[in-house]
C-alpha cells in the first residue's frame, strides 16, 4: 500500500508514495463508500477481533443487541453499507449450563465471555417423534436451536448437534451418555462481561487498521479515547490509509468546554458533533449514538455531494437548540451542529470538520467534509493504481507515460463523476527520474457545493414596469 513521503526523502522499500501540498493559485479504481469501523461492547460474539458485516446480514446474529451494539445500529441508520466491527475488552467469564443425562452430564458453554443471560430448553420435537430440540434463549428471545436424534445415546447426539455452532460448545462430562431429560428455560451460570480499558481501545484500533474504512466511531464520550482515535488516524495516514473519526461528548458538558474539545483537534480527519442530544421517534439519543449515525452519513455520502443541510429523518427533535451566535461560534470552532430547516426537520447545519487553522500544505478546502472526502478518495484511487504498477513497467519514457496515463484515467473518471473540476498528471520537474524512482505531480481543482447564497433585492418606487 502507498505510504507518505516528505519533500527530499527517498524510500528504501519498493512502492508508491504520496505527498500532499497546497495547490498554487493566484493570491480504473473506483470509489469505496459506506464503510464504517465501529468499536463497541457486547456480551456475545468474537472478542478483540474484527468481524466485517454487510448491511443486509445485520449484526444482531453475531453480537446481539446488548451493551453498546447500538452504535452499529445507528451507523446503519446513517447509511453504512458495511461495518468493520470490533468488540472491545479483555478477560471476562463464559456462561455455561450442565444438563443431566442418563449417566453424567452434557455441558453447554458460550464460546465468548459475557453476561448474556442465556437459558436452555430441551423438549420433544412436536412434528417428529424421533427428534428432540435444544433451544437457547437470550432473555425471552430464541437465540439458537439445534435438533438431535431422540432415543439411544442422546447425550452424544446433542454434543454432535452443536458441532457447527458459532456461539456454543457442547461436551460430555462425568462420562455423560444416554437420554437427556426435558428441561424448560434452565438458566446458564452467569458469566462476566470483559473489562474495558484504554488499552483495549488501542488494541481494537490495531485490529481495525487491517481493514479499509471511510469513517470510524467509538462507543464512548471519553475524551481520552477520542484522542486515541485521532492519533490512530494520523498514524495510518502516514501509511496511506484515509479515515475520518466522528465523536461527540455528553451534552451535559458545558458548551464552551465542548467548543474547546473540538478546536483541540484542529484537523481534517476528525468530526465533532456538538449538540448530540436528540429525540428519535421512540427514544432519546446522545453522545456516541449520535456520532455513530453521523459516521454512517459521512461514509455513505458520495464525494460529489455535501451533507450541509441534509435532513436526518431519524431525528424528530433537537434537545439542545442554539442561538444564531452559538451556531456561528460552533462552526468557527470546528463543530458539526444540528438545526431545523423551515419545515422543522432536523438537518446538519454545516458539514465541516474540526480543522480551524490552515498551514503550508492545507488550504481552506480541508475544513469541509465533502472536499476532504473527495481528496481522500482521489488519493486512495490514485495510490491503489500506482501501487498496482510498481515493478510492472520500466522506468523510461514509455513506462512513465504508462503510469501517467493510468493515473490520468482515474482523474478523468472523477471529473466525469462530478467530483473534480479538473486534474492533470505530469512528471515532476523538480526531481529527475533515475534508477527505480520516478515522481509525478497531480494538479487538482476539486469541486465545492453552493453553501452561501447571497441575494441582492433591488426595489423601485415606480409602479410602471
What does each of the following model-derived ranges do?
Residues 2-64, 68-392, 403, 418-419, ...:
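A glycine- and small-residue-enriched flexible loop/hinge signal that marks low-structured segments
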Residues 395-443:
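C-terminal structured domain segments
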Residues 430-465:
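C-terminal edge-of-domain segments
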Amino acid at each position: 500500500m502507498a505510504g507518505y513521503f516528505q519533500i527530499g526523502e527517498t524510500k528504501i522499500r519498493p512502492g508508491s508514495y504520496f505527498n500532499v501540498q497546497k495547490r498554487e493559485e493566484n493570491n480504473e479504481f473506483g470509489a469505496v463508500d459506506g464503510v464504517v469501523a465501529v468499536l463497541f461492547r457486547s456480551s456475545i460474539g468474537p472478542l478483540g477481533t474484527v468481524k466485517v458485516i454487510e448491511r443486509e446480514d445485520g449484526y444482531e446474529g453475531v453480537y446481539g443487541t446488548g451493551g453498546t451494539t447500538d452504535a452499529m445500529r445507528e451507523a446503519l441508520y446513517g447509511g453504512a453499507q458495511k461495518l468493520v466491527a470490533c468488540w472491545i475488552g479483555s478477560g471476562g467469564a463464559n456462561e455455561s449450563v450442565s444438563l443431566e443425562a442418563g449417566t453424567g452430564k452434557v455441558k453447554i458453554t458460550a464460546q465468548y465471555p459475557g453476561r448474556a443471560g442465556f437459558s436452555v430448553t430441551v423438549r420433544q420435537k412436536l412434528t417428529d417423534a424421533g427428534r428432540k430440540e435444544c433451544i437457547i434463549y437470550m432473555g425471552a428471545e430464541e437465540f439458537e436451536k439445534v435438533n438431535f436424534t431422540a432415543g439411544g445415546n442422546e447425550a452424544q447426539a446433542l454434543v454432535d448437534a452443536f458441532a457447527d455452532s458459532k456461539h456454543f460448545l457442547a461436551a460430555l462430562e462425568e462420562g455423560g451418555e444416554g437420554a437427556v431429560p426435558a428441561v424448560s428455560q434452565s438458566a446458564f451460570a452467569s458469566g462476566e462481561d470483559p473489562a474495558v480499558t484504554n488499552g483495549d481501545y488501542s488494541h481494537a484500533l490495531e485490529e481495525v487498521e487491517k481493514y479499509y474504512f471511510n469513517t470510524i466511531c467509538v462507543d464512548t464520550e471519553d475524551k481520552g479515547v477520542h484522542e486515541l482515535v485521532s492519533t490512530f488516524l494520523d498514524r495510518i495516514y502516514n501509511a496511506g490509509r484515509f479515515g475520518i473519526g466522528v465523536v461527540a461528548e455528553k451534552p451535559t458538558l458545558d458548551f464552551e468546554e465542548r467548543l474547546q474539545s473540538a478546536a483541540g483537534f484542529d484537523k481534517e480527519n476528525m468530526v465533532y458533533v456538538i449538540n448530540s442530544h436528540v429525540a428519535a421517534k421512540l427514544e432519546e439519543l446522545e453522545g456516541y449514538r449520535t456520532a455513530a449515525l453521523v459516521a454512517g452519513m459521512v461514509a455513505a455520502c458520495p464525494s460529489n455531494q455535501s451533507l450541509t443541510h441534509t435532513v436526518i429523518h431519524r431525528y424528530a427533535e433537537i434537545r439542545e437548540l442554539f442561538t444564531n451566535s452559538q451556531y456561528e461560534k460552533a462552526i468557527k470552532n470546528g463543530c458539526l451542529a444540528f438545526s431545523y430547516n423551515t419545515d422543522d426537520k432536523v438537518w446538519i447545519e454545516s458539514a465541516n470538520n474540526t480543522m480551524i487553522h490552515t498551514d503550508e500544505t492545507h488550504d481552506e478546502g480541508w475544513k469541509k467534509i465533502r472536499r476532504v472526502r473527495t481528496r481522500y478518495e482521489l488519493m486512495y484511487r490514485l495510490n491503489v493504481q500506482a501501487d498496482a504498477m510498481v515493478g510492472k513497467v520500466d522506468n523510461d519514457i514509455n513506462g512513465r507515460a504508462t503510469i501517467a496515463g493510468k493515473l490520468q484515467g482515474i482523474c478523468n473518471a472523477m471529473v466525469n463523476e462530478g467530483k473534480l473540476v479538473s486534474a492533470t498528471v505530469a512528471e515532476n520537474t523538480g526531481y529527475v527520474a533515475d534508477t527505480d524512482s520516478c515522481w509525478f505531480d497531480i494538479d487538482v481543482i476539486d469541486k465545492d457545493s453552493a453553501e452561501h447564497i447571497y441575494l441582492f433585492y433591488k426595489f423601485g418606487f415606480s409602479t410602471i414596469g
